[in-house]
Regions:
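Long, charge-rich, low-complexity alpha-helical segments
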Residues: 34-91
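Acidic, low-complexity/disordered tracts enriched in E/D and polar residues
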Residues: 1-47, 91
Length: 91
């Protein structure tokens, strides 16, 4: 993976599948050995990681949708953590 920055376009990592789980009332990340239950913030970020949107674009969408400002550093930190867990990948 290349270095992470605001223009990085993350996508769900190979071997993982993101889906909404009505029973859990949250997004979950499924993989062969189990499941990761995401909190609302993590689910909202992961749902936008389609390999087309940049980290900055994702932060902008979330700021608009939730009437918030300054989410860029938090989104970047989540993407970095998710990349270390291999939940997300980028070129």
């Amino acid at each position: 993976m290349t270095l992470l920055n605001a223009s990085t376009q993350p996508r769900v990592g190979s071997g993982f599948r993101l889906q909404w789980e009505p029973v859990q009332n949250c997004h979950v990340l499924l993989y062969p050995e189990g499941m990761v239950k995401l909190n609302q913030s993590g689910g909202e970020i992961m749902a936008r990681c389609d390999g087309q949107r940049s980290v900055a674009g994702i932060a902008g969408e979330l700021e608009q949708e939730f009437s918030a400002q300054g989410l860029g550093p938090d989104v970047l930190a989540f993407v970095e953590m998710a990349g270390k867990q291999r939940w997300l990948a980028w070129d």
